């Protein structure tokens, strides 16, 4: 209502201003004066009302401004709160992942701790066993006692081999008038001197030659062949005695028969004939072997030469057992002599 009155008052004033230029009749002067007076009173009343309403409007404007400012602040705070909520959610997810990782690591750590405890227990047991072993080594059944027993065993082996050497003496034919025993070979090494030829070595006074075994002819001396077969029988018997003394199972077993000795091969390089095959039955399977003759009486020279090769391999096996190598693939007597010499040497007792 106040605004409507103000508008009407302003319109009346504008009208009065337009009418200032009019000529007023005297009769109408009172009427106009009354109208002007009423307009002035209305304007004064409107001004007073304006002055009264102005503080109220200003206060309302301030309240509205403050409300708007606070609304904006609340909106900003709400946005910050939403951002904090998102950050809290992300942090919560990360905490859950970290918690799961921590649980897994705790499980792994507990497993490792258990393994460590088991390892510590095992280590403690091993340490106790080691201490017991050290006590045993230092005691009567220790290394010193083992060494003493080993020395006694080696001396016994030397004695037994010396008996074999006494039964089957090996000599070198040094000249037409004298023989030199192989035991008197000079030399600083365990091998002694270089091996001599097969014809210069004799076993129990009998020589051995590979010539009949490599090439048999009509003019071959039968006595030489028989002596070689007998010498090989002696060598085979000596090897069959020495091998058990050393506790070495020879690779190619021997069937002793003096000058008619055979040697067995379970994997022959020569294809055998059906008549040569001899079966041996074991608990699990049948194993066939071939016997090769160590003599030439009615035998194939190739098979006999192969038998000599196998016999030399047995001697080489014994040489390797005592830490030496063979003197040669055909040095049967020299290899046997070298084996006996090494076993009878003082260094053999301390050989490990």
UniProtKB/Swiss-Prot annotation:
Membrane topology, record value = Peripheral membrane protein
Q: Which GO terms describe its biological process?
A: auxin-activated signaling pathway; multivesicular body sorting pathway; protein storage vacuole organization; protein targeting to vacuole; regulation of auxin polar transport
The record's note on what follows loss of this gene reads: Multiple aspects of auxin-related developmental defects in leaves, embryogenesis, cotyledons, silique phyllotaxy and lateral roots in addition to unflattened and small leaves associated with an altered genes expression profile. Altered morphology of the VPS29-associated late endosomes. Enlarged multivesicular endosomes and reduced level of organelles enriched in PI3P, associated with abnormal trafficking of vacuolar cargo and its receptor VSR2 leading to erroneous cytoplasmic distributions of endocytic cargo (e.g PIN1 and PIN2) and seed storage proteins (SSPs).
Give the subcellular location.
Late endosome membrane; Endosome, Multivesicular body membrane; Prevacuolar compartment membrane; Cytoplasm
| Tissue expression | Predominantly expressed in the shoot apical meristem (SAM) and in the leaf vascular tissues. Also observed in roots, pollen and flowers.
Keyword annotations: Auxin signaling pathway, Cytoplasm, Developmental protein, Endosome, Membrane, Protein transport, Transport
Cite the GO molecular-function annotations of the record. Answer: phosphatidylinositol 3-kinase binding; phosphatidylinositol 3-kinase catalytic subunit binding; retromer complex binding
Q: Give the residue range of the signal peptide.
A: none
What cellular-component terms does GO give this entry? Answer: cytosol; endosome; multivesicular body; multivesicular body membrane; phosphatidylinositol 3-kinase complex
Main function = Dispensable for autophagy but essential for efficient targeting and degradation of biosynthetic and endocytic cargo to the vacuole. Required for seedling development and plant growth as well as for seed storage proteins (SSPs) vacuolar trafficking. Controls multiple aspects of development by affecting late endosome morphology and by regulating vacuolar and endocytic cargos (e.g PIN1 and PIN2) trafficking and distributions (e.g. polarity), thus influencing auxin transport orientation.
Q: How does it assemble?
A: Component of a complex made of VPS38/USL1 and PI3K main subunits such as VPS15, ATG6/VPS30 and VPS34. Interacts directly with ATG6/VPS30 and VPS34.
The protein's name is Vacuolar protein sorting 38
């Amino acid at each position: 209502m106040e605004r409507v009155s103000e508008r009407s008052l302003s319109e009346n004033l504008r009208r009065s201003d337009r009418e200032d230029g009019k000529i007023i009749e005297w009769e109408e002067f009172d009427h106009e004066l009354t109208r002007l007076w009423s307009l002035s009173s209305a304007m004064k009343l409107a001004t007073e009302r304006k002055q009264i309403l102005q503080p109220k409007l200003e206060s309302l404007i301030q309240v509205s401004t403050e409300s708007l400012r606070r609304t904006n602040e609340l909106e900003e705070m709400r946005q910050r709160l939403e951002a904090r909520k998102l950050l809290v959610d992300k942090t919560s997810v990360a905490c859950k992942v970290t918690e799961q990782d921590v649980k897994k690591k705790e499980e792994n750590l507990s497993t490792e701790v258990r393994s460590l405890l088991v390892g510590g227990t095992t280590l403690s047991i091993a340490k106790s066993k080691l201490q017991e072993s050290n006590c045993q080594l230092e005691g009567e059944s220790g290394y010193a006692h083992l060494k003493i027993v080993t020395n006694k065993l080696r001396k016994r082996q030397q004695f037994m081999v010396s008996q074999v050497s006494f039964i089957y003496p090996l000599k070198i034919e040094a000249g037409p008038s004298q023989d030199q025993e192989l035991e008197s070979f000079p030399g600083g090494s365990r091998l002694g001197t270089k091996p001599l030829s097969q014809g210069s070595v004799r076993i129990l006074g009998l020589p051995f030659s590979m010539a009949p075994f490599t090439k048999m002819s009509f003019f071959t001396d039968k006595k030489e062949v028989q002596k070689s077969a007998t010498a090989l029988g002696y060598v085979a018997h000596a090897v069959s005695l020495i091998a058990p003394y050393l506790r070495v199972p020879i690779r190619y077993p021997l069937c002793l028969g003096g000058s008619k000795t055979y040697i067995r091969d379970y994997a022959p390089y020569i294809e055998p004939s059906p008549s040569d095959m001899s079966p041996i039955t074991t608990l699990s399977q049948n194993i066939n072997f071939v016997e090769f003759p160590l003599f030439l009486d009615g035998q194939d020279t190739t098979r006999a030469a192969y038998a000599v090769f196998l016999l030399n391999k047995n001697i080489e096996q014994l040489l390797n057992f005592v830490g030496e190598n063979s003197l040669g693939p055909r040095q049967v007597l020299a290899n046997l002599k070298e084996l006996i010499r090494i076993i009878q040497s003082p260094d053999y007792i301390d050989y490990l």
